[in-house]
A protein has these predicted regions:
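Bacterial N-terminal signal peptides that target proteins for export
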Residues: 2-16
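Hydrophobic h-region of N-terminal signal peptides that target proteins for export
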Residues: 17-26
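Proteolytic maturation boundary segments
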Residues: 25-50, 230-276, 317, 416-525, ...
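M16 family metallopeptidases and their MPP-like homologs
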Residues: 53, 58-74, 80-81, 98-141, ...
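Catalytic Zn2+-binding segment of zinc metalloproteases
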Residues: 88-95, 549-551
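Non-catalytic, conformational "gating/processing" segments within enzyme and secreted inhibitor domains
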Residues: 157, 172, 209-241, 442-443
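Short, conserved secondary-structure transition motifs
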Residues: 161-167, 259-274, 381-392, 584-585
């Protein structure tokens, strides 16, 4: 037997053996890990984590593939690589050579995001078995078969450069990047996701391919599926598409080590000043806070709302209402490791930035030491967050996308645990975190201008999320809605009409909705040619003032009442119409309708 024939036989035998092993592997079903409030986690033998959220009330399917790699994982010379790879994965595979076109043909669009801790790709499609199978085939194929070619890298470089230049020309974004880089001396959170221009433009294609092969593997990925689908069918297709992908070899350079770089405890104030072309000024401050999984984040969320809430926020009252600043905001970011609490103010070009910064310090550090947070402030903030979480959970698509961030923090169930913590946080908790983390010694300040005391703060380590969540069951699942036929004929049949004596027309579409959710849409048309003439601006001003209070409720009380009724949305108007859209729950619908009437009938136009 010739050597050439032996080689052919050997290769054929190897292929048969590999095919047989993959077939056996694919036939092994997934393992159910846990289930919380209607969401169930499974694990494939190759390590792929699968999260299913069936929602028959949604006529769509959202497929969200998250890879546990972001800019935090980039090595020296690799900054921007995770984001650059996100672009190249859309360039296709041999089986899916034109991904954007295929998505468009199915009524979806290319969607991908890169953050500090993760990268995700997602598509929302009409709920059919064919679309589900196609999306799963796409995601499994581009997990391991993306081209990642030098030609695609060159062609995409213009797009990436444009993103870089857009960020560099945005005063807020560039100041935030500079302030973060000063706040984090060693940790990769101090490097922007977009990366250094020199790294992005100079990265060898082979290095990018190595990054792709290392991190785009089933044992480093989480597949979230939400919407209208049959779990049994979905699991069968997931095993069929992803189960044949072998577990990667994690030896040598392919081993993924936990990131272990930690910044030393900050020992004094730091500051950054940017002088660039621009039309506005900014003052911002970053304080180090614990990781997103830490129990203090719930209290820090409440604290940020106490500072920046419109109408009652302390910074809003001190800076916006006094017209010293155009706007203020505060965010307690939730990352896998120790993250930032960002607070900033936007100031007019001719305003006094020094005066604004002095006021910011008085409010922030006064809140931490003297003018302590009150019970009413905590309750108002709690109602705001819990309302948004509750109403947001009515959208399975929204939850599917949110879970990417919670997965990257350590576990998708942290979403529910954080909600529970928000419900239980006390005023003393908020005062404690303010006193613990809001210290000048723990701050990095940034100023954008157009044209020190050794009191150290120890940041807790990332908690053991597995131990923390062992046995966690969550609450009862939200009541599912009906599987609604969205055809015009069915909508017409199900819609109930009524006309009042005054000519007011009412259309009602009763159906079982997820979480007993109700949406009210109101449209009032009025006016004639004489009343419309020269009144456009006046009409817009009147419409814009409707949500600022009534004879019974001032603006803050009106917002509180909407939160109490678990309603969101609003009423506005113009010179020829008024109306709005509000969302609430079924039991509160009568009260919400009464409130809409009050807003329209008895508004107060304070000077």
């Amino acid at each position: 037997m010739s050597g050439r024939w032996c080689n052919k036989v050997s290769k054929f035998a190897v292929r048969l053996a590999a095919l047989a092993s993959l077939t056996v592997f694919a036939n092994e079903g997934p393992t159910e890990i846990t289930s919380v409030e209607g969401i169930t986690e499974y694990r494939l033998n190759n390590g792929l984590q699968v999260i299913l959220f069936p929602d028959p009330s949604k006529p769509t399917i959202t497929v969200n593939m998250t890879y546990l790699v972001g800019s935090r994982h980039e090595a020296y010379g690799e900054t921007g690589m995770a984001h650059l790879l996100e672009h190249l994965v859309f360039k296709g595979t041999p089986r899916h050579p034109n991904i954007p076109q295929e998505l468009t043909e199915r009524g979806a669009s290319p969607n991908g995001t890169t953050s500090l801790d993760r990268t995700n790709y997602f598509e929302t499609l009409p709920a059919t078995d064919a679309n589900l199978e196609w999306a799963l085939d796409l995601e499994s194929d581009r997990m391991i078969n993306s081209f990642i070619s030098a030609e695609d890298l060159e062609s995409e470089m213009t797009v990436v450069r444009n993103e870089m230049e857009s960020g560099e020309n945005n005063p807020f974004r560039i100041l935030y990047q500079r302030t973060m880089s000063m706040a984090y001396l060693w940790h990769n959170y101090g490097k922007s996701t977009i990366g250094a221009r020199s790294d992005v433009e100079g990265v060898p294609i082979d290095r990018l391919k190595d990054f792709y092969r290392k991190y785009y593997q089933p044992d480093n990925a989480v597949l979230v599926l939400a919407g209208k689908f049959e779990p049994k069918f979905a699991l069968e297709k997931i095993v069929e598409k992803f189960g044949v992908i072998p577990t990667p070899d994690r030896s040598g350079v392919n081993q993924i080590y936990p990131t272990y770089t930690r910044d030393p405890i900050q020992d004094g104030e730091r500051s950054v000043t940017l002088r660039r072309v621009g039309d506005v000024q900014y003052a911002m401050v970053i304080h180090h806070i614990p990781s997103g999984a830490h129990e203090d984040l719930a209290a820090l969320d409440i604290l940020s709302h106490v500072l920046d809430n419109v109408t009652s926020g302390r910074l809003h009252e001190a800076l916006v209402e006094s017209e010293k600043a155009v706007s203020v905001a505060s965010y307690a970011y939730q990352y896998r490791e120790s993250g930032p609490m960002l607070t900033y103010a936007q100031v007019r070009k001719d305003g006094s930035l020094d005066e604004v910064w002095e006021t910011m310090q008085d409010v922030i550090y006064g809140t931490a030491t003297e003018d302590l947070v009150t019970d009413s402030e905590v309750e108002r903030a709690r109602a705001f967050f819990l309302k948004n979480i509750e109403l947001g959970f009515n959208s399975s698509q929204n939850i599917a996308l949110q879970l990417s961030n919670w997965v990257a923090m350590g576990d998708w169930r942290l979403f529910f645990l954080h909600r529970d913590r928000l419900a239980e946080v006390t005023t003393e908790d908020v005062r404690r975190v303010a006193a613990t983390y809001l210290k000048p010694q723990n701050s990095t300040v940034g100023f954008f201008l157009p044209t020190d005391n050794p009191d150290r703060v120890a940041i807790p380590e990332v908690p053991d999320t597995a131990a923390m969540l062992a046995g966690y069951k969550g609450r009862d699942a939200v009541k599912s809605g009906e599987s609604f036929d969205t055809s015009l004929a069915n909508i017409d049949t199900r819609t109930q009409w009524a006309t009042f004596d005054n000519g007011f027309k009412l259309a009602m579409l009763p159906k079982e909705t997820r979480g007993a959710n109700v949406v009210v849409s109101l449209a009032l048309l009025f006016g004639s040619e004489p009343t419309l003439r020269n009144n456009v601006t006046r009409g817009e001003m009147v419409g814009g003032m409707l949500m600022r209070g009534t004879e019974r409720l001032d603006r803050e009380q009106l917002i509180d009442e909407l939160n109490r009724l678990r309603a969101r949305g609003g009423v506005s108007g113009g010179v020829y119409s008024a109306g709005g859209i509000l969302q609430t729950i079924r039991e509160n619908l009568p009260a919400v309708i009464e409130l809409i009437g009050e807003i329209l009938k008895t508004p107060v136009f304070d000077a």
